[in-house]
Amino acid sequence: MDLITLGKAAKDAAFQLATASTAQKNKALAIIADELEANAADILAANSKDIELGRQAGLSEAMLDRLLLNESRLNGIANDVRNVISLTDPVGSEIDSKVLENGMQLSRRRVPLGVVGVIYEARPNVTIDIAALCLKTGNASILRGGKETFFSNMELVKVIQSALAKAGLPAASVQYIEKPDRELVTQLLKLDDYVDMIIPRGGAGLHKMCKENSTIPVIIGGFGISHIFVDETADLAKSVDVVENAKAQRPSACNALDTLLVHERIAEQFLPMLVAKLNGKVTFVVEPKAKAYMTKAEQVRDASDGDFDTEWLSYTLGVKVVADVQEAIDHMREHNASHSDAIMTNHLQNAELFINSAGSAAVYVNASTRFTDGAQFGLGAEVAVSTQKLHARGPMGLEELTSYKWVGKANYLSRA
């Protein structure tokens, strides 16, 4: 596969998309949604191949469930595309405007990024989500999904490209790297003549590889240890419910709770309540002070080196007792708190200290970490959750897939 040819085609498509009207882009999205439903039999047949190969490869049931498409899920994906149609198109909107002393009207106008390369996990719905968001914002995309969803993704991209052609937009607006060869990922990361941004969705290893090898700006996101600190002033019963939601609602999510920090003055009362709530469901990984109050835990082990640096993505929870909010913050700084973190407290000053000190992309007071999500934030779908500080931070919706240009309008004005 020649990635330079792919890149050239994407760049040409991006120039056309940049001037496409919202109506034309929405028309393409509507056709994509309809074609997903019309081609359900072919898509589900391709997905069945992926599922069978996954079983032969020994994938876990949880992983197979992430790969699985059925009629209900496919209809949901189609409706998600229709929801993108209803979102406001940010392209062309003015961020701000002013008239200078020389009479020039100067504004900042939102524009597409250009070509976005996305390397992502083995979830077929992500292929559609990313394509739809990039299309709505006038960006061309080059996609590289997990090898476990190869047949599903090939069929989905075929449907997308057919819909684009029917809408009068270039099929190369959405392209897929067909071969699972890892060397092609390395080549994509060097394609800076054609690709404007790389978004890796996956584990720390993928992010590290992209940062070290890419000559293209990389948005780092998804990975980060999520914490909840239960302060001494917190409502303990309500805090237990929030911790359960953050840990057990969807433990494989990147915004699920990894480490629980508990104020030493309420640990003796709070931790037995937590054990009673989560016993039989969660494995507790504990330091000595916490262990002393968790004697009735059914699944528990002592914390070892690296445990508090682990994004569990499972029914495992690190637990530590701390002296106060400052020690909680210090622990978070030491253990990669960059994604979603929360404090349970009824103390205003402690809440503000936590908000101002936490280095996370999203910080919550008396709320679950599970809210870090484009849909929950009212952004619609998201292309990723950024944990870095440049360009975008937190859930990346439509606006985060744009940049801006300065536009100056005057009456044949020359600089003095």
From Swiss-Prot:
Recorded metabolic or biological pathway in which this protein acts: Amino-acid biosynthesis; L-proline biosynthesis; L-glutamate 5-semialdehyde from L-glutamate: step 2/2
Any single Gene Ontology cellular-component annotation: cytoplasm
InterPro entries associated with the record: Ald_DH/histidinol_DH, Ald_DH_C, Ald_DH_N, Aldehyde_DH_dom, G-glutamylP_reductase_CS, Glu-5-SA_DH, GPR_dom
Catalysed conversion reaction: L-glutamate 5-semialdehyde + phosphate + NADP(+) = L-glutamyl 5-phosphate + NADPH + H(+)
Keyword Amino-acid biosynthesis found: yes
BP term (GO), one: L-proline biosynthetic process
Main location: cytoplasm
EC code(s) of this entry: 1.2.1.41
Subcellular location field: Cytoplasm
Designated name of the protein: Gamma-glutamyl phosphate reductase
Organism: Vibrio vulnificus (strain CMCP6)
Primary gene name: proA
